[in-house]
Amino acid sequence: IEKIYSNGYEKSMIVQDYIPGDDSHMRVLTCYSDQNGKVKMQCLGHVLLEEHTPKGIGNHAAIITEYDEEVMTKFKNFLEAINYTGYSNFDIKYDARDNKYKVFEINLRQGRSNYYVTSSGNNIAKFVVEDRVYNKELPLKIQKEPFFWRCIPKQVVYKYVKNPDLVKKCKELDAAGKSATSFGYKADLKGNFKRSSYVSLYYINQFRKFKKYCK
């Protein structure tokens, strides 16, 4: 902090407690609140791995959706109490020191890893169109079934996720067809050599990046 201020920074700083735990202690919650401030969709994700490159650190790379009624109800009540409308995306971390979840921030948008929401059956584009364009009264949709999403090769997930129970769950979901990758859209890949080559190189590169940066 002294070095920061001695180099010309003059404004206030917020000092935040470091919460211990690897990537799998992270959670991400995506919600949609309609034009009347009522929550109409919630999808909670248990983060398995994040990116570890200097530029990408903190971005979610693999997620399993999960249902936690207590946590999701608290956020629903908060959003409705402030009459929030639109997308909201919360970064949360489980603190093993007191067995509580700590909220880092609310993003007033969908997250970079939002395909974990769409691929698990919650098309957020449909929610906003039906709410804002067609003025429909939407039912509350809460994601309860587990679904495995990733934007990296599943072999990377299996290798670098430290919790064997989570790895086992990933493999079970994948075997059951309850998994998806952001780079697996068949219409993009079929007959498209350039796109297929890019995706293949991207995946190969992920093995190299995790080997170098994920310690």
Language model region names:
Residues 91, 116-118, 141:
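Short acidic alpha-helical/loop segments enriched in Asp/Glu that coordinate divalent cations
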